[in-house]
Amino acid sequence: MGHSIYLADDEKSIRELLHSFLASDGYTVHSFESGDALLEAFRQEPAELVILDIMMPGTDGLTVCRELRSVSDIPIILLTAKDSELDYVMGISQGSDDYLTKPFRPTILLMKVRALLRRVEMDRGKTAAAVDELHYGDLRYSATENAVLRGNTPVALTQTELRLLSYMMKQPEKAYSREELLNAVWGFDSEVETRVTDETLRRIRKKLLHAGSTVSVSTIWGFGYKLKEAERT
């Protein structure tokens, strides 16, 4: 039996199309026409990945995403009919791992599903060999506490933000390309078009500033990003 996926979309035609497409690739798919139904099923038996339409009657996808993220770090993909920057930012801020704007090709969704589940498997394999602590500037990553801390205070990061920042802290002076970060943190191939790296790092930069950290995320135009310890005067 393949990985279990929960899918919620109030549009029956889309729900049935995606269900059939994912099931044909070997996944065990359970479809729901509302966010409330998905949440109820998840409480009984958690899935390994969730796909959510944002605009659903009743409990919308953003709320469901927030509820799921409060109890689980499973991969979450949001779907929306709006090509809205606000929807994208809201989705990432609620803890989603990626985002697709309708209409989209089912093959793109399948690539993202495969990549996210591959990342989960990679994370499990790395757990035993994981570094217990990392330090850069006034930041400390603790595997035991599953957090990045400034002093004794955790920086308020989502699990995806934590994975990304801790990955960059392993070699903080290194310049990371978007492609490397996509592969290392999300498991995506460089051909998968996504804004998720840029948006996640923008949020990390904002949160580090809010925490008063000397560490910031520096943009290397045309290439990617690196961590930088700011000079304090």
Question: Each PLM stretch: what is its role?
Answer:
Residues 147, 152-215, 221-223:
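Positively charged, aromatic-enriched patches within helix-turn-helix-type DNA-binding elements
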Residues 66, 70, 75-135:
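Basic, amphipathic DNA-recognition helix from helix-turn-helix-like DNA-binding domains
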Residues 45-51, 56:
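Active-site beta3 strand of CheY-like receiver
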Residues 2, 46-48, 71-75, 191:
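His-Asp phosphorelay/catalytic-motif detector in bacterial-type signaling
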Residues 16-24:
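Charged docking surfaces used in two-component/phosphorelay signaling
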Residues 33-34, 60-63, 87:
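Acidic catalytic/metal-coordinating carboxylates
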Residues 26-33, 41:
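Short hydrophobic/Thr-rich beta-strand motif most characteristic of the beta2 strand and flanking loop
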Residues 4, 115-175, 179, 228:
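Short, Lys/Arg-enriched segments at the junction into DNA-binding effector domains
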